[in-house]
Amino acid sequence: MALIVDKHRPRSLDALTYHTELSERLRSLAQSGDFPHLLVYGPSGAGKKTRIVATLKELYGPGVEKIKIDARVFQTSSNRKLEFNIVASVYHLEITPSDVGNYDRVVVQDLLKEVAQTQQVDLSAKQRFKVVVINEADHLTRDAQAALRRTMEKYSPNLRLILLANSTANIIAPIRSRCLLVRVAAPTHKEICDVLASSAKKEGWPIVKGLHQRIAEESGRNLRRALLMYEAVYAQNEKVTDSTPIPPPDWEALIGQIAKEIMEEHTPARILQVRAKLYDLLTHCIPATIILKTLTFKLIPLIDDALKADVIYWSAFYEHRIRTGTKVIFHLEAFVAKFMRIFEMYLMSMDL
């Protein structure tokens, strides 16, 4: 059974319900005959991917939706083999090079070179170039981004790149200057409520406006999250009213539990217990930066105002370490230990 977030996903630019001006801009780009490289950025759950798939459909027609998943093997200079999944149609490829970590340069170089040197298979296609959609472009290493820049310069007649990112801050200037930047802003609370009402109508659920408003506020303007929360409410309750509780995601509840445990006891034994829970979150594919950010926001209301600036400083410090390092668990654990030390020192100063 498909989730409503997938089942009701708009398939064309006409079906998109908000940012209509942006949809019109994308349509005119697709029809112009001179489609540029795009860098599409904005917060999670704003609809970047949905808009790009709809734009590809405008570019090539319904054939874009006939996709398959290919497993490819790439070899590094040290003869290490990397297995990598590619989502592909006749007209486009979709890749997430950050899945292979620091070896993303190998994937970017080899795959894009191969695609760019291949002519369009479908001779009746509207466009003579192929499109490569790169997810999480802001997580690419500097080497991979440099390889990407060279590919953009060399193979632009046969290849167009669409980069998806949450922020442009981590993308090198030469790539930004070669792309048309498209910002997809997060939907407003009202726009989220309208989408929830539309989904309820399609599913035959009663429209509960108070619940829609609460979900829109709790989702942090993340439409994907709002739809998942909405479905969770209906999955767990037979009768839904304005006051029906909204269940938090399991990972968020676990981080809340970690925050309480950190506050209760400041010992090496407690750090070991917390480490096990952090490992659990990481093995369930929760990104380390999200864990750190959520944990910080859970801890902030529990501490005195005098400590808040210090805790936020160290959270930012270890977030930078996570982004530049490879063993994320070290930096998460270091933040927990640092917080315990700061809090313990504060308690000792209070006793004096």
Swiss-Prot record:
Primary location group: nucleus
BP GO terms, sorted: DNA repair; DNA strand elongation involved in mitotic DNA replication; DNA-templated DNA replication; leading strand elongation; sister chromatid cohesion; UV-damage excision repair
Organism listed in the record: Neurospora crassa (strain ATCC 24698 / 74-OR23-1A / CBS 708.71 / DSM 1257 / FGSC 987)
Quaternary context: Heteropentamer of subunits rfc1, rfc2, rfc3, rfc4 and rfc5 that forms a complex with PCNA in the presence of ATP.
Cellular component per GO, a single term: nucleus
SUPFAM superfamilies on file: P-loop containing nucleoside triphosphate hydrolases, post-AAA+ oligomerization domain-like
GO molecular function: ATP hydrolysis activity; DNA binding; DNA clamp loader activity
Subcellular localization, as worded in the UniProt entry: Nucleus
Function: The elongation of primed DNA templates by DNA polymerase delta and epsilon requires the action of the accessory proteins proliferating cell nuclear antigen (PCNA) and activator 1.
Keyword vocabulary terms for this entry: DNA replication, DNA-binding, Nucleus
PANTHER family for the chain: REPLICATION FACTOR C / DNA POLYMERASE III GAMMA-TAU SUBUNIT (PTHR11669), REPLICATION FACTOR C SUBUNIT 3 (PTHR11669:SF1)
Name recorded for this polypeptide: Replication factor C subunit 5
Stated family: Belongs to the activator 1 small subunits family.
Nucleus among keywords: yes
Annotated InterPro entries: AAA+_ATPase, DNA_pol3_clamp-load_cplx_C, DNA_Rep/Repair_Clamp_Loader, P-loop_NTPase
Gene3D superfamilies referenced in this protein's UniProt entry, alphabetically: 1.10.8.60, 1.20.272.10, P-loop containing nucleotide triphosphate hydrolases
UniProt key word DNA-binding: yes
